A protein has these predicted regions:
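N-terminal domain-start motif of subtilase-like serine proteases
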Residues: 2-52, 62, 80-94, 228-237
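Short, glycine/charged-enriched secondary-structure capping and boundary segments
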Residues: 64-68, 172-175, 204-207, 229-230, ...
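Subtilisin-like serine protease catalytic core
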Residues: 38-74, 81-137, 153-156, 184, ...
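Extracellular S/T/G-rich loop segment that most often corresponds to the catalytic His/Ser-adjacent loop
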Residues: 54, 74, 78, 207-308
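Structured segments of extracytoplasmic/periplasmic soluble domains
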Residues: 102-106, 142-149, 182-185, 275-282, ...
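Substrate-binding/access-modulating region of protease and related hydrolase catalytic domains
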Residues: 128-211, 222, 240-243, 296-307
């Protein structure tokens, strides 16, 4: 967890504040999720273990500092297990890293500011896809693996931030049957409804399963006090079985989330942070030194500093 964390740099002091202490609308920095929804901080997930199915994962410091809360990792695609692969992320790791840290991160890299709603939650991570695809049948296999390992890791929650390849009735779809079986086994299954709000009535398994708690989204512009709460592009029912989904909507945009180390995005963020701290005299030299990192800055680097 030493090298490769440069892009997960510590967050400076929080967003701008008005004289009365409220969030200053001039600041683009979003408030932490807990502040935005008025979460009760006494509920931290302590003693609870949740499993996550996603395309890949990374052992982010917010999950491993001061001690790891990742109890197990299983790669369904290769059959490999053990925590060591989490130290070497690839491009497929970003989505699961974000979903797990947003759900269970303790804010270690932001001095606790951007901690999740469940900073003490234990995790079991199961990779069920690649960067390009998460297949319907692989999600089903992942749910089956969680059921088989429920007692071993005391799994009480299953989060699925992926969806199947097609609409299907929960009465005869294999993935849907596994999701129902997980609930019968005592696991609370939660699934994202999907991002097909442009296609009404399109909800795929596992989000379409009656026993699954399905979650959609809203956009509060980063702060509810702005008074600009709008709908997100979430999918919505009725499902192919005539069921209304989702059951819950919550924040889906302006979510403080980590960036995967050693990726083009992480290098761009490091450059922007360096420029933010630099004096006017230092900025041209920094831009020349990091040419090729971020195309918009390459195009603008010969302009006067005050125009950047």
């Amino acid at each position: 967890m030493k090298k490769g964390h440069e892009s997960s740099s510590r967050i400076p002091a929080g967003p701008l504040r008005s004289p009365d202490g409220s969030h200053d609308p001039r600041s683009r920095a979003p408030l932490p999720v807990g502040e935005r929804i008025g979460a009760d901080t006494k509920h931290t997930g302590r003693g609870i273990t949740a499993a996550f199915l996603d395309s890949g994962f990374y052992a982010h410091p917010d999950l491993t500092t001061p001690h790891t809360r990742i109890h197990a990792y299983y790669d369904l695609m290769s059959g490999k297990s053990g925590l060591e692969p989490l130290e070497h992320p690839d491009a497929s790791s970003w989505h699961g890293m974000m979903s797990s840290v947003v759900a269970a991160g303790n804010g270690a890299l932001s001095n606790g500011r951007f901690k999740s709603l469940a900073p003490d939650l234990g995790l079991v991570l199961c990779k069920v896809g690649t960067l390009s695809r998460v297949h319907h049948d692989d999600i089903a296999r992942g749910i089956e693996w969680v059921i088989l390992n429920r007692a071993r890791y005391d799994i009480r929650i299953l989060n699925i931030s992926a969806g199947g390849d097609y609409e299907a009735s929960y009465l005869d779809d294999v993935m849907s049957r596994f999701a129902e079986a997980a609930v019968r086994a005592g696991i609370c299954v939660v699934a994202a409804v999907g991002n097909r709000g442009d296609k009404p009535g399109y909800v795929v398994p596992p989000a379409s399963v009656p026993a699954v708690i399905t979650v959609g989204g809203l956009d509060d512009a980063g702060n509810p006090s702005f008074g600009r709460v709008t709908g997100y592009r979430s999918s919505f029912g009725p499902t192919i079985d005539g069921l209304q989904k989702p059951e819950i909507i919550t924040l889906a945009d302006w979510i403080p989330a980590p960036i995967l180390p050693n990726t083009p995005t992480s290098k761009q963020v490091q450059l922007l942070a360096k420029l933010h701290r630099a004096s006017d005299e230092e900025i041209p030299k920094i831009l020349d030194k990091h040419a090729g990192t971020y195309a918009p800055l390459d195009e603008a680097r010969h302009q006067p500093v005050y125009l950047l």
